[in-house]
Amino acid sequence: MLHIENYIRPRNHWNTISHGEDINRLNLLLSKFGLKVDDVIDAPTFTTYISNLDVDTKIKSVLRLEDNFGIAVKDNNVRIYLDGDKLCIEKRGADNEVAICDLYKGLSDSKLNLMIGIDNKGKKIICNLAKAPHILVAGMTGSGKSVFLHSCILSLLIAHPRDCEIYGIDPKGNEFLQYAPLNNFNFVKDTVYAIQTLKHLVDEMEMRYSTLALARCRDIDEYNKTHSMKRIVCIIDELADLMYTGGKQVEEYIVRLAQKARACGIHLIIATQSPRADVLTGLIKCNIPTRMALTVTNNTESRIILDQKGADKLNGKGDMLFLPVGRTKPIRIQGCYMSDTERQNIIGVALARQDPNFA
């Protein structure tokens, strides 16, 4: 575990917004159904107004007023949803930054944790990739998709500077280049070589299963109690480029890894700014249930990445909907942001800690 306290910015004081006018306007609408604003929750960039529902409340009639609620709180992208017996009206709030200093203490050298962000209730969200065990990510230019991928890489570098091998597949060649000097980072730019890398990971997976069988171990966690096997995380910055080149072959490799690689410690984080059906195919989606949706261009793309609407109404800059495995409703989160200086500082600390003979 890297000690990065001296290399990251301290937390800034978070601003809040005034709620009085919003509450008055919302109460005028809610009073028609015998409801009112009962609570307000401020998160870094969201404000949620909560109304306690009665058993006889006409829920469908209330939900139809989404546009009216948007006018009331002066936010065209207002989000209305149910949380148990509560009606939640969520709008853009104060413009506060979620930084590494807010989240990095949730990392652990015993878990494959990723810094995600802070949700709309103010809770810090950390994802254990070992349980995910793979993630699909979608977001248009300016959504914060690349920042999210950097956050994943830095999470792994901070918690596992030596015992996690990372493959960064970056067809455009400019997103992951700064990590290339790291001994445990395999920078892959060429699309053809990227497809070969996926095949290599499939072969590595099969070899690892043979190793586990010989040791009579069920999975990598059991094996590592008496032996040593590094975890591998493959991060693909743009799946569309690979699908256009490799098509069915790429899909086959990804599906095989998604189906089997978890137990032997290989994990995928696959991103695209083109969440179309020919990129995120049905086979890929059904084998990778954990999803991260940043802002997408339309309702159709939202349904492809999340199987539901909503991602087309996000605000960009790290505003995201996170759908962990096992959940049917996504969590709205403001993602973790790190400056270029912080990123370079952490890379420098990781380089200093690495064994020169790391392989």
Set out the residue ranges of the language-model regions.
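P-loop NTPase catalytic phosphate-binding loop
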Residues: 1-13, 25-64, 68-72, 79-90, ...
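Accessory nucleic-acid engagement/destabilization modules that flank
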Residues: 15-18
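C-terminal regions of RecA-like/P-loop NTPase motor modules
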Residues: 349-359
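Conserved C-terminal helix/linker of AAA+ ATPases
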Residues: 220-221, 359
